């Protein structure tokens, strides 16, 4: 399908005079995804036109000063997707078919994919053999940046204190090393301790604090964790690693210990099993010296205030006083974690058991656990932390603007910072970069329209998986998706688009959901794929349409890409089922955690086990909008100082930190 170039873009193309051509620098395309910026890389007019023709098919426009990089093309290839690459062309088509017709179509499809061992070209038999392509009318913009500006973005993220996903951390480090900015990085300024440890190992720049040094050594040896765990299993593993090291590796370990023997002696007694596990012929002398120095250098461990503040016993006044004294030293992300933890404690006080989303994204349920809850004290503590969070935001809620007075003198005035939020999406406070779903903090929600809501997944074979399955399980136990119903009505209409088992070149599965449909969980299962695969989750909402009208108006399609209000790439490293959305009281609440199961269809019993605690968690996320207003920001729908409608993950991190 031909792409119509918008008039405003044609004006830029016709007026564009490219600078002197030179080979543009290379920046990993995933950093473009992270920052919505690309390194300055000029091009000729033909390249500018070609790049933006590709960009518009993905819903983007690329500034002429950054069109010359090959990484832009990789970025655009990844971002281009057709949400209408579904089994059936319209939801009406699904509704019109009987159960036997639906089954026959699916069996024909399976025979052409699994039945031929995927030797047939393309997606096999699919009724929607020519998926409709709908042009974008709204575009995100990729802007140019200097090498120094991209470094500041990377370094700012490291200093923010947010817990950073290791893959993101590797991207940041790669850029800082490749563009020779290492000398500008102070490792002690990297606020997140795990990120600090990984950065130190991979760059050779070490921190000064004792526990930070020990974390670095732990990651250096294990290559997968900086956590200081003293369990028998962990110590045994550490000893085996040291025993298996080469002579050069042991000498390097000895060198690091020797250079930091005094500082490590201050924590020797606290982490004695870990340090002794590093003992070998090359390190025995220095470890013995650390042990002797510990006699005079030992610093007793004090349990941190914030680790014990939820259980004050009868010292509530003293705890509140101490909280007020210490709260401003916390990062914004630690404050958000504490506030969310307080709300979970309060909202879950009448429930038995607790649900924890652990580091690998799996869910752990502690049955029968019921922590103490002093509601009055916890609300007071919550207000102390919230007030500090708002004070921090308030420093960014004032914008200075230059104007002229009656005598033509330049004067500087202050006004509230104008901020534009995504329409129809309620953003939550970010607690960790690991707890983002795409560019949105976990718990962010989409407000459902009365009728026209579509949630879907999209993938390609070359993303690591042939066959993903989209499922919806209602609170009543009804199941929609593969091996379940294709359509039905439980207070509101639910329709499934059909099962795709190959994505060559691409595939999508969708669910049509009305607002009055029952509370439900939407899950994604990987039926066939490798460990390092991914899919794109998207939500489209059209409040102006009713009862599938838009399928006729949009060339018989299921999804209008211009109505997509949420999209996120989600990595699926294991074979468990991922719960990606909780539908609760007219909202789609975004999540991303595995159930830990290995069944091909999500277990209804598992859903019931985590249902109660999922509801507690869903009701404990904190709205960003409420705190922005309290801090003094002005919410606008037009021209804004801060526009989060096209936000990158980094934009939100910079706003709150």
Predicted feature descriptions by range:
Residues 2-251, 255-657:
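Intrinsic-disorder/low-complexity signal
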